[in-house]
Amino acid sequence: MIQISSETQLFIREHSSDNVRALALQAKKYPDIDMPTAITQIAGRQVAAEKIPSWREMEEIWYPKHLSLEQCSSEITARYKARLSQGDSLTDLTGGFGIDCSFLATGFKSATYVERQEELCEIAAHNFPILHLNHINVRNEDGVAYLQTMSPVDCIFLDPARRNEHGGKTVAISDCEPNVAELEALLLSKANRVMIKLSPMLDLSLALKELKHTQEIHILSVNNECKELLILLGQTSPAEIAIHCVNLLTKGTQEEQHLVFTREQEQRSQCTYTDSLGNYLYEPNASLLKAGAFRSIAAAYPVRKLHPNSHLYTSDSFIENFPGRIFRIVNQCSFNKKEVKENLADLKKANVTVRNFPTTVAELRKRLHLTEGGDTYLFASTLNNGQKVIIRCEKV
């Protein structure tokens, strides 16, 4: 049973921004403080300040040990998931720290949190009332065992553990625990809607092959870093499955980039390739690159693709709402030594990206005598006619 004394609680408040490693070395200075608990809570608060900002000022919230917190969702992705399903009843079969459950539960009249680790259940049972989530029932059980006997609900959520027995990260559905492919029929006998959070490294084709009742796919990125692959199962699967490519933004005025396509649309879409560059260069966000929506981008926006294997686009006029990074082209040159010297000799620092080019970023940076960073962006790529180009840009 977790208990935190008033002295330890005060210590946590007073040292909430301290370096936890330094504090651990000073444990003998504070004999009346439960230092392991204090360290866990202080570290948790510091991570939560970034991952779960709305909990930042809630001093009563308890946090788990680092591994569980490392694996949990961020608030921004949990809020997105909450938009995808509402109803009367929800069951989260892999409760964990409870972030996903706490945000998903706001759209349901009742919810059940299932977790086999007793300590995480204690933490969840303590935290949910503080978050005004008194309608969540906490069950300290194995999720698969609970699934066998549970009453039907509107929605089931699972976040299978993506670590193998040696502690390494895994990406195949069959290597996750529980194996949702084996449980698909049972899950859909208990709920009309099943939401599964998987590794963004999972191959989409493999996921669609293994999960026969997929209705939607959502690929979530945060600030252009791919974070989650969400698969929504239902009683029937449409002929063409919608793939939502979402980039959630915490900086700037734009909050979200969102493009929806199907694999069949991708095959049907027309794409214009180019031998020359316009005034602007576009790099699709991480979700679009993961999904392989290369033709669909060209169909949705008035852009030209540099080459079938160069996943960069160009246009003469500025396209403000393009779902990715936008750059103004300053100049371009071939990989010829003379041209490189004429166009790039003044550069000491630049952000270098390689797309469909015969050298690596490290090799190119070394050849150009550049350090990483600054306001200049260099894209080394290939045009449709096979010409190798280095494109010098500024971010819009």
Task: Pin down the residues of each PLM region.
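SAM-dependent transferase fold signal centered on methyltransferase-like domains
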Residues: 1-396
